[in-house]
């Protein structure tokens, strides 16, 4: 009797193992699984960071700051020109700002991004040049968007340094570094009145850039 019971248990274990193996095989061969694992590493990383609790918390902080009365309009990311794409947007570089808002009540542009670990300068801190590039790019893109809207033209961002135009102004900015920016940290960029300010997730001011051409 015990031998028969043992055989039944062995049979059930074999069937269970076969079903588990079949289910795992189906999951691995499914289109969703295959599509995800064929994504480039950068796409997977952006997919993961966009669900980060810290990123969500940063957005919540913005709403709380404005006492939930701010009417924000979502816009395309500020960082779209070739300038940051060539110099900062590479693996572990400046992760593209995936959310950009315009607050019409306070006339302020708000963007959220991630300073990649490849932008490390001194002792695992974000390089000062990368920080300056991010702030200047934000200033120039907002300037371009305002000009385009005023002239009812295309709102495509431009590079910070104009080229092939003899009627150009000389770019001039004042960069002030307030606190170290850890590489790989989330940051908020706020642009208002020709000043771009960089904050961390705790709303601490890290750096700012003033456009001296205005």
From Swiss-Prot:
The chain crosses the membrane at residues 10-30. Residues 147-157 have a biased composition (Polar residues). Its main location: membrane. GO terms for molecular function: fatty acyl-CoA hydrolase activity. Keywords: Membrane, Transmembrane, Transmembrane helix. GO terms for cellular component: membrane; mitochondrion. Signal peptide: none annotated. It is a single-pass membrane protein. One of its GO terms (biological process) is acyl-CoA metabolic process. It is found in: Membrane. It comes from the Eukaryota. This is Uncharacterized protein C3A12.08.
């Amino acid at each position: 009797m015990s031998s028969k019971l043992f055989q039944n248990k062995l049979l059930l274990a074999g069937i269970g193992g076969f079903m588990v193996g079949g289910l795992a095989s189906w999951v691995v061969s499914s289109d969703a699984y295959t599509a995800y694992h064929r994504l480039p590493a950068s796409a997977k990383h952006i997919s993961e960071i966009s669900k980060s609790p810290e990123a969500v918390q940063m957005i919540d902080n913005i709403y709380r700051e404005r006492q939930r009365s701010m009417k924000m309009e979502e816009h395309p990311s500020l960082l779209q020109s070739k300038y940051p794409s060539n110099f900062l947007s590479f693996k572990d570089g400046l992760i593209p700002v995936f959310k950009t808002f315009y607050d019409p009540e306070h006339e302020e542009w708000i963007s959220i991004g991630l300073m990649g670990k490849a932008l490390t300068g001194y002792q695992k801190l974000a390089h000062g040049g990368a920080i300056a590039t991010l702030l200047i790019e934000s200033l120039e893109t907002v300037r371009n968007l305002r000009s385009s809207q005023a002239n009812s033209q295309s709102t495509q961002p431009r590079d910070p340094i104009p080229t092939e135009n003899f009627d150009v102004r000389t770019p001039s900015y004042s960069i002030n570094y307030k606190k170290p920016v850890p590489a790989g940290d989330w940051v908020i960029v706020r642009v208002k009145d020709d000043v771009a300010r960089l904050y961390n997730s705790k709303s601490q001011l890290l750096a700012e850039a003033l456009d001296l051409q205005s």
